[in-house]
From Swiss-Prot:
Keyword Protein biosynthesis: no
Keyword tRNA processing found: yes
GO biological process: tRNA modification
Molecular function terms, GO-annotated: oxidoreductase activity, acting on paired donors, with incorporation or reduction of molecular oxygen
Enzyme class of the recorded protein, top EC level: oxidoreductase
Record protein name field: tRNA uridine(34) hydroxylase
Enzymatic reactions: uridine(34) in tRNA + AH2 + O2 = 5-hydroxyuridine(34) in tRNA + A + H2O
InterPro entries: Rhodanese-like_dom (IPR001763), Rhodanese-like_dom_sf (IPR036873), Rhodanese_C (IPR022111), TrhO (IPR020936), TRHO_N (IPR040503)
Lineage: Bacteria, Pseudomonadati, Pseudomonadota, Gammaproteobacteria, Enterobacterales
Region Disordered: start-end pairs: 319-350
Length: 350
């Protein structure tokens, strides 16, 4: 019987990936469609992906699939063919290719079955997730940005918006997608007669959000096809002005893709212009925050003097201090300080 999960340590897998000579391509894709047996589908797909040396993070649920992966360049076309023939619903699914890619985004394949591929918190049985807004392509996006009757809504988390967003886009201040949905409805009531344009990283969140807005009575709703990634790619290919400012946060080891030269965020320690996310080097903290090179040197990659001092302690003493401490990593929020999160790199499904 085939092994359907990883049995090798993370450290060993990461070292193996870093030693690879063949370049990899980072790809993301999603599809809302009915999966009758998510576990059975997961197990079958796991075998397909492992045979092609695919790494990454894949979620499956009755409502569909959400994946961020890396594929050896020589196997990308084979991967595409096998994915498209795996299920009729996946035939022709859009594959978002990373804009900036060193091929080191993932080093292990994790494939999980969940209740939802995006944690939305929606429990309304009358909600129809298929009743989505209209797609906007790159040229349409730029036209909408110049339309005074249009309002752009960023459906990403605060730490994503902080480092990059579309011109004049509204932030829905929240730490998770499930918190954003009701806030978006509340905040946009005063703009109910406007054209609502929603966007996110790759399209999965804004697609569901557009359906939620229509469910709540908003009639003029659009969402950007393929999200920021596809918009920037197509705009560059077509010679259009790229109207996204700053960096696009991504949920892998890269933590960001440069879209424009502007740096709109600031170091959380000294306030210098900076948009590079990192995790505190203190294993007892792992705060996700923005740190400039000067502060990284000053604090030895830590988020505070306290963590810097703790990192300098003998390993045994560090372990003793971590014992009993809340087992969860944190994200820095400028308005609320430290927040708990489940991963060093936040979970894209949250």
């Amino acid at each position: 019987m085939p092994v359907l999960h990883n049995r090798i340590s993370n450290d060993e897998l990461k070292a193996k990936m870093l030693a690879e000579s063949e370049p990899r391509t980072t790809i993301s894709f999603y599809k809302y469609f009915t999966i009758a047996s998510p576990q059975q589908t997961r197990d079958a797909l796991y075998q397909v992906f492992t045979a092609l040396d695919v790494f990454g993070r894949v979620y499956l649920a009755h409502e569909g699939i959400n994946a961020q992966i890396s594929v050896p360049q020589s196997k990308v076309e084979t991967f595409r063919q096998q994915l498209y023939t795996f299920d009729p619903a996946l035939d022709g699914v859009r594959l978002n290719i990373a804009l900036e890619d060193d091929g080191k985004s993932f080093w292990v394949l994790r494939m999980k079955v969940r209740d939802r591929i995006v944690a939305d918190g929606i429990d309304d049985p009358t909600f129809d997730a298929s009743n989505v807004g209209d797609y906007l392509k790159a040229a349409d996006v730029n036209a909408m940005l110049d339309d005074p009757d249009a309002v752009f809504i960023d459906m990403r988390n605060h730490y994503e918006y902080e480092v990059g967003h579309f011109e004049n886009a509204l932030e829905i201040p929240a730490d998770t997608f499930r918190e954003q949905l009701p806030k978006a409805v509340e905040m946009l009531r005063e703009h109910a007669d406007k054209k609502i344009v929603m966007y996110c990283t790759g399209g999965i969140r804004c697609e569901k959000a557009s359906a939620w807005m229509k469910h709540n009575g908003f009639n003029k709703v659009w969402h950007i096809e393929g999200g920021i990634i596809e918009y920037a790619r197509r705009a560059r290919e077509q010679g259009l002005p790229v109207r996204f400012i700053g960096k696009n946060f991504v949920f892998d080891e890269r933590m960001g893709e440069r879209i424009s030269d502007e740096v709109i965020a600031h170091c959380h320690q000294c306030g210098a212009p900076c948009d590079s996310h990192t995790n505190c080097k203190n294993d007892g903290c792992h705060l996700l925050f923005i740190q400039c090179p000067q502060c990284a040197s000053k604090f030895n990659g830590c988020c505070s003097e306290q963590c810097c001092e703790e990192l300098a302690l003998p390993e045994e003493e560090q372990r003793r201090r971590r014992a009993g401490r809340e087992n969860g990593n944190k994200i820095f929020n400028k308005s609320r300080g430290r927040l708990n999160s489940k991963l060093s790199i936040p979970d894209p499904a949250e």
